[in-house]
């Protein structure tokens, strides 16, 4: 259960970082930001998109910090 909560939090973080990045790239285009956030909200409801985002984030964690995902899963199982 804790693992599912962690994955949900990671997904929310990914969406927030993406929206922030887009907002910094085009600050004068608020309607673009709203459209992107709407699209991301719709995609967040699609299980395949969520699963892909989680996989990408986990892959990034492993590459960036050398975190072993199996150790992380074992940590939250106990």
Curated annotation (Swiss-Prot):
Q: Does the keyword Glycoprotein apply?
A: no
Which GO cellular component term is one of those annotated?
Answer: extracellular region
Q: In which tissues is it expressed?
A: Expressed by the venom gland.
From the UniProt record, list the residues forming the propeptide: 20-42
Main location group: secreted
Q: What keywords are annotated for this sequence in UniProt?
A: Secreted, Signal
Domain of life where this protein originates: Eukaryota
Q: Where in the cell is it found?
A: Secreted
Annotated signal sequence range: 1-19
Return the protein name: Small venom protein 2
């Amino acid at each position: 259960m804790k693992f599912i909560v962690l994955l949900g939090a990671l997904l929310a973080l990914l969406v927030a970082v993406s929206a922030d990045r887009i907002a910094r790239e085009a600050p004068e285009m608020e309607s673009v930001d709203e459209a992107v956030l709407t699209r991301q909200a719709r995609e967040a409801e699609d299980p395949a998109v969520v699963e892909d985002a989680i996989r990408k984030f986990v892959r990034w964690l492993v590459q960036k910090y050398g975190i072993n995902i199996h150790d992380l899963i074992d940590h939250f199982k106990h």
